[in-house]
């Protein structure tokens, strides 16, 4: 048989069912062009600008580039892997000299384009290396070598590769002469990230079941429009694109439920800032006390910046999944005001319990597990126009995580809002700083919100945009334009001026005394919060309160409850202490950890709090006298804060550095009041200033600074390079340090520096036995991978996250089941039930107290 008996229509790209390389290449380029059309205009303009071409040329070039991503499959070692092709190759006399099952087609793609095809077309070395490198990274972290280059059949396969390139060039570029957009090193980072993200997304869509049978019907000359419509429908049905919405420019247009005469000072000032600033604004930082309407002002700013930069929508990143769950409800209510129901996606590892999934899609690609995770509803939220979730989801965009570029592509289409900026530690702040560098490079507008922010942290968060000394006005809005102009607007009118009574109470190490003090404070009625820094202490104080026979309502709230029980407690917390006063108890004590510190809209008459860094104490004050319309007992005329301190600080340990705790004590020991907001900026500045500390604290401060340095260094090992340092696609297993399995307890790429955690479910023996009967035994362990979606949900609702070290060496193979797929990383443990409590080694699960550990 003649050598030309194998044509491009015979060369396989997919095998089940068969799809030729010609069909897959064409559909991938077509999908890329449809995605391009659906991108916000700002992203089109930016990518075209980075490549120094027009938007029309950008669409053509993208289709051409993406269509060639699998050209490396046109190679003998790769084709030999499929038995049906093997027979055809033998018949045609094209049997390879040796076989290699580890051949990586994307490596062949790079070599074919960079070393031969594009070189022969006259492309400059730096350009062909860059563009080939983008395509070579579309399967991230795969090990193996490229195909054979110098064998007896090389010229035949090289000829087919050249034919494929020429066909795609005519189809997409519509020219005999190839052109290669010029690009300089500083632009290669952002351009490479966008091009790679678009390549991956296009490949996955072309590999989905939309086109599983495309070989039987797709013809570029006859059914091009039909294929385009399929991609468009998928993007629309998936919520991956949306029409540009004009939310208006006035605050009351954006928030139609807030009348013009009801605007708070901050809201008037943010509106004026955008009206008076002519340049495009790159970043806005809003610093204001609790209760000033920061969220509404932040969303207003986000939408104005999206309009300016021709982007669509926003991603709101928050510190925890609990705060995300709350915020998604607020954002859905907001978008419903504009007729955009059901458009907000929720993103965190357990989000699919809260957010209902859309129909699932199958993918015929070796990356189908990742394609499914990314293009099924929960994950693709970062690509959707409106999304809310943990800030980790955005931070992963700059970690060495598989397919992190898809996160950058998603963020590039919208405004990023980072809420509760004060709550992130040194390690997370380093990650956020790198994220902001990429935001600037990709023209992603950013809004940051904070109640209190130390000057040093403020400077760090704004350093990607400016280096000059910052104003310390408070409360204030700081905006930086695209040219680096800094606009600072001091908020002229604050709604809440209060004088908080503050006292130190040295009983932190005595749970019985804390319980007695709490009961005394509300003996004549009132709602009190006892806020402690560690779960064990909260459980002990709650038990002491119950044992002393307190005659009011009590509730314990912390993070070590199973997911469903935690949601119940959160709902009860809001029912009792939230905006609706109809269920507010006459007398109640909530014992809690930091879960009530952030974004929960609850209001207490008085608070007792364990000592913490000063900015966090001020944040906690925001939960006292929060609502003006709350009926209060006569003994509570002003907000009251009782700060619990240790008698023996040297032997007291919690989650905060001793020097910051002791600095708070030092700053408050001679005070009886704090004026909100007047005293806040100076207190926060002094709280983080070593020179304001007494001399005996110097050793603690030095330890703290060394720990900060170590945390800062730790973050760099996980970060991708700054955008200005060129394009560094993650192609090899060595360069991708981490997987992107959010379900696995917590992401293996560290967005937070701390002890590793595991998500566990404690089941009593009979429930465990029933589940174990359905488990598969694989390599000596029992795995759960065949449960229905509802069964998976029921199991995850019973799950709780604990430190991994608490489990070390305890579980035997007979008492543990390992979750897979959506349950990835989950451990199901067999416990023993006694009197409503489930025991497992030194751990016990109690309905009222949550998970407890016994020494």
Give residue spans per PLM region.
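Accessory nucleic-acid engagement/destabilization modules that flank
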Residues: 2-247
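Walker A/P-loop
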Residues: 279-302
């Amino acid at each position: 048989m003649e050598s030309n008996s194998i044509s491009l229509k015979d060369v396989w790209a997919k095998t089940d069912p068969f799809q030729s390389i010609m069909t897959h290449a064409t559909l991938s380029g077509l999908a890329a062009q449809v995605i391009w059309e659906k991108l916000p205009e700002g992203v089109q303009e930016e990518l075209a600008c980075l490549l120094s071409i027009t938007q029309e040329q950008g669409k053509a070039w993208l289709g051409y580039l993406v269509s060639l991503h699998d050209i490396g499959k046109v190679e003998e070692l790769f084709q030999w892997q499929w038995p049906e092709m093997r027979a055809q190759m033998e018949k045609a006399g094209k049997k390879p000299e040796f076989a290699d099952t580890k051949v990586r087609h994307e490596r062949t793609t790079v070599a074919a384009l960079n070393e031969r095809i594009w070189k022969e077309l006259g492309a400059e070395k730096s350009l062909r290396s860059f563009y080939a490198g983008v395509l070579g990274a579309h399967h991230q972290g795969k090990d193996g070598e490229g195909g054979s280059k110098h064998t007896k059949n090389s010229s035949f396969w090289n000829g087919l590769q050249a034919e494929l390139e020429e066909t795609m060039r005519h189809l997409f570029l519509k020219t005999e002469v190839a052109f290669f957009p010029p690009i300089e090193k500083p632009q290669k980072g952002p351009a490479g990230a966008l091009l790679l993200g678009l390549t991956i997304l296009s490949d996955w869509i072309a590999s989905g079941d939309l086109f599983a049978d495309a070989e039987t019907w797709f013809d570029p000359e006859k059914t091009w429009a039909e294929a385009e419509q399929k991609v468009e429908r998928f993007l629309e049905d998936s919520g991956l694109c949306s029409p540009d919405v004009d939310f208006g420019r006035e605050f009351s247009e954006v928030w139609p439920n807030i009348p013009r005469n009801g605007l708070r000072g901050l809201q008037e000032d943010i509106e004026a800032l955008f009206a008076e600033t002519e340049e495009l604004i790159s970043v806005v930082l809003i610093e204001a006390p609790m209760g000033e309407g920061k969220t509404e002002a932040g969303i207003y700013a986000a939408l104005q910046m999206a309009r300016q930069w021709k982007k669509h929508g926003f991603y709101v990143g928050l510190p925890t999944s609990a705060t995300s769950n709350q915020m998604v409800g607020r954002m859905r209510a907001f978008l419903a005001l504009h007729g955009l129901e059901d458009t907000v996606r929720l993103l965190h590892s357990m989000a699919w319990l809260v957010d209902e999934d859309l129909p699932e899609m199958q993918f015929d690609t070796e990356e189908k597990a990742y394609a499914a995770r990314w293009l099924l509803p929960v994950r693709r939220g970062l690509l959707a126009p409106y999304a809310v979730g943990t800030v980790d989801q955005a931070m992963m965009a700059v970690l060495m995580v598989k397919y992190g570029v898809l996160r950058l592509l998603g963020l590039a289409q919208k405004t990023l809002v980072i809420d509760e900026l004060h709550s992130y530690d040194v390690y997370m702040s380093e990650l956020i700083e790198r994220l902001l560098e990429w935001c600037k490079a990709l023209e992603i507008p950013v809004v940051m919100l904070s109640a209190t922010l130390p000057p040093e942290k403020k400077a760090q968060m704004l350093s990607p945009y400016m280096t000059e000394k910052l104003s310390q006005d408070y409360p204030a809005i700081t905006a930086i334009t695209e040219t680096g102009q800094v606009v600072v607007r001091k908020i002229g009118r604050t709604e809440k001026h209060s004088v908080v009574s503050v006292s130190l109470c040295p009983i932190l190490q005595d749970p019985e005394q804390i319980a007695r003090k709490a009961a005394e404070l509300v003996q004549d009625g009132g709602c009190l919060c006892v806020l402690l820094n560690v779960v064990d202490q909260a459980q002990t104080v709650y038990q002491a309160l119950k044992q002393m026979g307190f005659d009011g309502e009590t509730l314990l709230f912390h993070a070590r409850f199973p997911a469903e029980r935690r949601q119940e407690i959160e709902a009860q917390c809001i029912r009792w202490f939230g905006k609706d006063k109809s269920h507010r108890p006459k007398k109640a004590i909530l014992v809690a950890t930091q879960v009530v510190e952030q974004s929960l809209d609850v209001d207490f008459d008085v608070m007792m709090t364990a000592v913490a860094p000063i900015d966090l104490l001020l944040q906690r004050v925001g939960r006292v006298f929060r609502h003006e319309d709350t009926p209060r007992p006569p003994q509570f005329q002003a907000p009251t804060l009782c700060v619990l301190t240790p008698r023996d600080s040297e032997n007291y340990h919690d989650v905060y550095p001793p020097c910051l705790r002791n600095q708070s004590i030092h700053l408050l020991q001679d005070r009886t009041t704090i004026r909100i907001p007047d005293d806040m900026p100076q207190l926060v500045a002094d709280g983080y200033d070593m020179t304001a500390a007494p001399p005996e604290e110097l050793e603690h401060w030095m330890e703290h600074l060394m720990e900060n340095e170590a945390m800062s260094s730790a973050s760099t090992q996980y970060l991708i390079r700054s955008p200005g340092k060129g394009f560094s696609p993650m192609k090899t297993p060595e360069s991708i340090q981490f997987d992107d399995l959010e379900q696995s307890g917590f992401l293996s790429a560290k967005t937070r520096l701390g002890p590793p955690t595991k998500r566990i479910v404690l089941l009593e023996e009979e429930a465990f036995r029933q589940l174990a009967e359905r488990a598969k035994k694989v390599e000596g362990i029992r795995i759960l991978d065949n449960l229905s979606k509802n069964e998976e949900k029921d199991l995850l609702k019973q799950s709780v996250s604990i430190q991994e070290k608490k489990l070390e060496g305890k579980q035997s193979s007979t008492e543990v089941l390992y979750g897979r797929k959506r349950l990835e990383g989950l451990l199901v443990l067999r416990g023993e039930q006694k009197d409503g409590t489930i025991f497992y080694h030194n751990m016990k699960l109690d309905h009222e107290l949550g998970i407890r550990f016994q020494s």
